[in-house]
Regions:
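The start of beta-strands in P-loop NTPase/AAA+ ATPase cores
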Residues: 22-24, 81-82, 203
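Conserved acidic, metal-coordinating active-site core of Asp-based
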Residues: 125-218, 227
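Non-catalytic pre-domain segments flanking phosphatase-related domains
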Residues: 1-28, 32-36, 40, 47, ...
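Short, structured coil segments at secondary-structure junctions
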Residues: 77-80, 166, 227, 245-247
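Glycine-rich phosphate-binding "P-loop"
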Residues: 32-42, 174-183
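Mg2+-dependent phosphoryl-transfer enzymes with acidic/Ser/Thr/Gly-rich catalytic loops
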Residues: 2-7, 19, 188-266
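Conserved Rossmann-like nucleotide-cofactor binding loop
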Residues: 31, 70, 211
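Active-site phosphate-binding/coordination module
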Residues: 43-134
């Protein structure tokens, strides 16, 4: 499919008709939750949570795949039957059990050193950027920084320098830079795992940021292997043009996602 080739009605009708074969993979921030200045204050849009359990019963699998820690996702969404893949698929909460890739455990001292270096850096201290310590990774947020456009380049350079010094991978996003262990994994790996483990023959991915592009790429690859796939982008003022261009369907903000999920659950 190419960008904008399907309507909400067509997509929902097709997915519901083959629900037991479909894996539904959803991002959190900017998709299920409105983007807010304080990442810790992010909450799912009202009406989202009540839909997740009915969707999990109807579809082959429902998974939340995010850069957030998996326990955070499970705590704030709390729907049973849903898989919560955090840290880009390297951590999971499923049926109340937490699993973590052992390579993340081994890298915890390195992440701690990077967190300390960021906290002590001139760019972070003077800008007022907020550090989100995820234990297995660390993120620098500038969304609530005064004159954040002025500080974007200094914070970017600092994050890249410290990532290189600690041999960590840098993942940029919308006003956020995440430093994490260079363990090969992205949202696309999470999508492929959910599809393989659920036996799904079709998959829909919904996301709003650069980190969702690998998930879109996974859908494209699965289609070449004989699966059906749908790539859904969530539009906002900050949505990456590449993501919108790669989408089969574009929804307007978490409100659009809510309406789409309501159609899938109806």
């Amino acid at each position: 499919m190419t960008a904008g080739t399907v309507t909400v009605e067509q997509a929902a009708r097709s997915l519901v008709a083959r629900a037991q074969e479909v894996a539904v993979c959803l991002d959190f921030d900017g998709t299920l939750s409105p983007v807010v200045d304080d990442p810790q204050a992010a909450r799912p849009l009202e009406g989202i949570v009540e839909l997740l359990e009915p969707l999990a019963r109807r579809f082959a699998a429902v998974a939340i795949i995010s850069g957030r820690p998996a326990p955070y996702l499970a705590e704030h969404l709390g729907a049973s039957g849903v898989r919560y893949l955090g840290l880009y698929g390297l951590q999971e909460v499923h049926q109340g059990q937490i699993s973590v890739d052992p390579r993340l455990e081994a890298a915890r001292p390195t992440v701690a050193a990077a967190t300390a270096a960021l906290a002590d850096s001139l760019a972070v201290r003077e800008s007022g950027a907020w550090l989100e310590d995820k234990i297995y990774s660390v993120a620098v947020h500038t969304r609530r920084v005064p004159d954040r456009d002025q500080w974007a380049d200094p914070v970017d350079r600092t994050a890249r320098q410290i990532a290189a010094e600690q041999r960590l991978e840098l993942i940029p996003g919308k006003m956020v830079w995440e430093l994490r262990p260079a363990v090969p994994s992205d949202k696309g790996d999470g999508v492929r795992r959910v599809v393989a483990e659920s036996g799904a023959r079709a998959v829909v991915v919904v996301g709003d940021d650069l980190g969702d592009l690998p998930a879109f790429a996974a859908v494209s690859q699965l289609v070449t292997e004989g699966h059906h796939g749908l790539r859904v982008a969530v539009r906002s003022e900050e949505a990456p043009p590449d993501l919108l261009a790669a989408a089969d369907l574009v929804l307007d903000g978490p409100e659009g996602v809510l309406e789409f999920l309501r159609r899938l659950a109806a």
